[in-house]
Design a protein with these regions (language model features):
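N-terminal acidic, proline/glycine-rich, low-complexity intrinsically disordered segments
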Residues: 1-7
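Condensing-enzyme catalytic core of the thiolase-fold
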Residues: 10, 15, 21-454
């Protein structure tokens, strides 16, 4: 009996090419299995406590940026318009949650002592994960023993740094209270979930990569339900000071995405969690389908023009592969939630990549940027953009970007269908389902909703 190796070895070059095409087609079909979004939970700046209040903020074009609250740090003590001033920064703005101290530890069976040692990111994410499950119509305490995955983006560890100068405050709970792995694992532990639990740190794309990994886990039958998203809280001035010294932060306290005034971003914070399920299972179980993930992709720049600098060819590649994974044409996408940091370097590079892939077509395509509303949520930025995209698809309305007057002079949109929405507008009329995309440096996701939920 001939082995597979023998059969392939005996093939002609033409036969091997044909077999490769068949394998490639089969892998694309498997990778394009649609994943339903069945629940959403979020805590975001501007008093956002869920998808309804988030949509109100977006549709009304509200800015959630304020001066740094006194319970974080003394903004005036660290402020100096001179970027070179040691220990000072030319910004005192950000976008913050109203309350990060309130936590019902008893509800989750956590002692007050352990709760005090927990990074507020752990506390907030645990609450938002619970709320997302409730939004999905699921009883969180009834999921024990289920193959439910938890994939969350977590970035900085500023709470742990608070103990650096006061070792007397460190106890046994300080280790578990500050570990990224426990931020995710605690959700699985408290709910008794048996699927994979993974903490993801890919910097600003962390939460979008988490969604990508959760979709892959569902497609591979590694899990039957997944919680995906991320959290980021700005607790201390040191990180903000370092970013300011890089020249990344706007001295005006605004994010001018794609605008001629782009001079950096504003830091924001928050948490977002989506509940994901294979579409076939969601339909079978009668779940409310809020949106459908058709495909996604992740890559890395490799050795390029700088460790922290974006790379246009890599961006084009990841967007192209996400569309290929989704098996949908670029021209069918009418809304892209961009990375849109409002930096003189990043915006033109991102626009060039988007224009190369999405620029051609008849129907206009809007470039959204929620960072203009609430700053850069860093580890939670991707999920904030993802939830915005799902809500935009649901409501059939494209919300406005803020702080846009005139294109960055190094961007030329004239030969493309891309535009920046400056007021709320109806979704372009079409017989096709609504489709949107989310772009974050290093990852891209294609989301759909509407007729046929595709």
């Amino acid at each position: 009996m001939k082995t597979t190796f023998d059969r392939i070895s005996g093939m002609t070059s033409e036969q091997r090419d044909k077999l490769t095409e068949q394998f490639d087609k089969a892998s694309r079909v498997a990778g394009a299995e649609p994943i339903a979004v069945v629940g959403i939970g979020c805590r975001l700046p501007g008093g956002v406590t869920g998808p309804e209040s988030y949509w109100e903020l977006l549709e009304s074009g509200t800015s959630a940026v304020t001066e740094v609250p006194a319970d974080r740090w003394d903004a005036e003590a660290y402020y100096d318009p001179d970027l070179t001033a040691p220990g000072r920064m030319p910004t005192k703005w950000g976008a913050y949650l109203n309350d990060i101290a309130g936590f019902d530890a008893d509800f989750f069976g956590i002692t007050p002592r352990e709760a005090a040692a927990m990074d507020p990111q752990q506390r907030v994410l645990l609450e938002v994960a619970w709320e997302a499950l409730e939004n999905a119509g699921l009883a969180p305490d009834q999921l024990g023993e289920s193959r439910t995955a938890v994939m969350m983006g977590v970035y900085y560890t500023e709470y742990q740094n608070s103990s650096a100068g006061n070792p007397d405050t460190i106890d046994a709970y300080s280790a578990t209270g500050n570990a990224h792995s426990v931020t995710v694992g605690r959700i699985s532990y408290l709910l008794g979930l048996k699927g994979p639990a993974v903490a993801v740190d890919t910097a600003c794309s962390s939460s979008l990569v988490s969604i990508h990994l959760a979709c892959q886990s569902l497609r591979m039958r590694e899990s039957d339900l997944a919680l995906a998203g991320g959290v980021s809280l700005n607790l201390r001035p040191e990180t903000q000071l370092a970013l300011a010294k890089w020249g990344m932060l706007s001295p005006h306290g605004k994010c001018f995405a794609f605008d001629s005034r782009a001079d950096g971003f504003v830091r924001g914070e928050g948490a977002g969690v989506v509940v994901l399920k294979r579409l076939t299972d969601a339909v079978r179980d009668g779940d409310r389908v809020l949106g459908v993930v058709r495909g996604s992709a992740v890559n890395q720049d490799g050795r390029s023009n700088g460790l922290t600098a974006p790379n246009a060819p890599s961006q084009r590649d990841v967007i192209t592969r996400a569309l290929r994974s989704a098996d949908v044409p670029a021209a069918s996408v009418n809304f892209i939630e961009t990375h849109g940091t409002g930096t003189g370097l990043g915006d033109p590079i991102e626009f060039d990549a988007l224009a190369a892939v999405y620029g051609r077509g008849d129907a206009p395509c809007a470039l959204g940027a929620v960072k203009t509303n609430m700053g850069h949520l860093e580890g939670a930025a991707g999920v904030a953009g993802f939830i915005k995209t799902v809500l935009t698809l649901q409501h059939g309305t494209i919300p406005p970007n803020l702080n846009f007057e005139k294109w960055n002079p190094t961007i030329d949109p004239s030969a493309t269908r891309l535009f920046v929405p400056t007021e709320a507008a109806e979704w372009p009329k079409s017989d096709n389902p609504r489709r949107g995309a989310v772009s974050s440096f290093g990852s891209s996701v294609v989301v759909g909703c509407g007729r046929g939920a595709t």
